[in-house]
């Protein structure tokens, strides 16, 4: 229904301006993108690396180029470009200039804008096939078929940097996957220390900030004349009597055993039901426990992370995606 309405709008615009179908396409895909000013925003640090592919025609490459990509691509992500036959090699690295989108007017399923191209020494398919690490990689084994939008782990990217460095290239000039620098040697003595020294720095590293993306002690009605105050509400709406939060977070000093975890879970679940939350997070000085709602919250279905785990870009990105309910 919406697609048909969109077609009607474009048709009306074309006829009102006496444009042919070809001229309308030229306007949409060439004139408008090149002449309508774009918002100049800072490129975020990369949280994920992806592979893209295809031959690069120098005549069609601009500072920012339209390219097929994974719809989950985020602005700032690293894009490793494999040029297909006859080159058959990784030749450059780009940075995503926009989030990936699904475009019904594009020949391929999804795309993004790419820029900040960095040429690197060619890493050929043959070299990858004989490399101890990449010879077992599924994308290499199928000779980069379906390359566009293939996710690369932090280990994949590190191993690729190893091969590039071996060719004498200064890999310090290449983008690095982002991991937060969480406080070291923290002194955790009370529950508030867990919140201020561990939880809030982690949320800030994901670019979520207090009173913008999350709120502490959100007052919610829990019966006639009674209010409760969950520790943190992430992606929240604090409209009185209609309070909502996509993610509910409860912090404790130390959940020493299953009984204490059970008590914290039951408390958090009661708040989550009032706020129509999709995710519950329990955290203490040692770890975070994530419960995702599948029809209901299940005490026995969870994912556990230790704070040190977030030094791994893949794990950091995995948690961010779990909490990124909008």
Regions found by a protein language model. Name each.
Residues 67-72:
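Short, surface-exposed secondary-structure edge patches
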Residues 36-46, 58-65, 103-178:
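Contiguous surface segments at macromolecular interaction interfaces
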């Amino acid at each position: 229904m919406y697609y048909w309405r969109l077609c009607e709008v474009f048709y009306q615009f074309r006829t009102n301006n006496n444009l042919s179908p070809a001229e309308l396409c030229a306007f949409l895909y060439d004139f408008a993108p090149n002449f309508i000013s774009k918002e100049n925003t800072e490129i975020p640090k990369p949280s994920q690396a992806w592979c893209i592919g295809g031959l690069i025609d120098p005549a069609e490459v601009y500072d920012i180029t339209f390219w097929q990509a994974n719809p989950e691509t985020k602005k700032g992500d690293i894009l490793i470009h494999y040029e297909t036959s006859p080159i058959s090699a990784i030749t450059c690295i780009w940075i995503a200039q926009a989030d990936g989108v699904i475009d019904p007017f594009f020949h391929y399923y999804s795309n993004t804008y790419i820029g900040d191209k960095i040429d690197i020494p060619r890493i050929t398919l043959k070299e990858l096939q004989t490399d101890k690490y990449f010879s077992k990689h599924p994308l290499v084994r199928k000779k980069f078929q379906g390359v566009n939008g293939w996710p690369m782990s932090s280990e994949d990217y590190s191993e690729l940097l190893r091969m590039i460095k071996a060719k004498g290239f200064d890999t310090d000039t290449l983008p690095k996957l982002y991991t937060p620098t969480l406080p070291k040697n923290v002194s955790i003595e009370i529950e508030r220390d867990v919140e201020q020294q561990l939880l809030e720095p982690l949320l800030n590293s994901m670019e979520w900030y207090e009173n913008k993306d999350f709120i502490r002690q959100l007052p919610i009605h829990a019966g006639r004349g009674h209010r409760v105050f969950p520790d943190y509400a992430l992606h929240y709406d604090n409209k009185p009597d209609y309070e909502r939060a996509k993610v509910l977070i409860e912090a404790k000093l130390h959940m020493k055993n299953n009984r204490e975890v059970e008590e914290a879970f039951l408390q958090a679940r009661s708040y989550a039901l009032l706020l129509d939350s999709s995710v519950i997070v329990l955290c203490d000085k040692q770890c975070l426990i994530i419960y995702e709602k599948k029809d209901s919250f299940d005490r026995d279905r969870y994912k556990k992370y230790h704070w040190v785990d977030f030094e791994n870009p893949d794990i950091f990105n995995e948690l961010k995606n779990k909490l990124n309910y909008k």
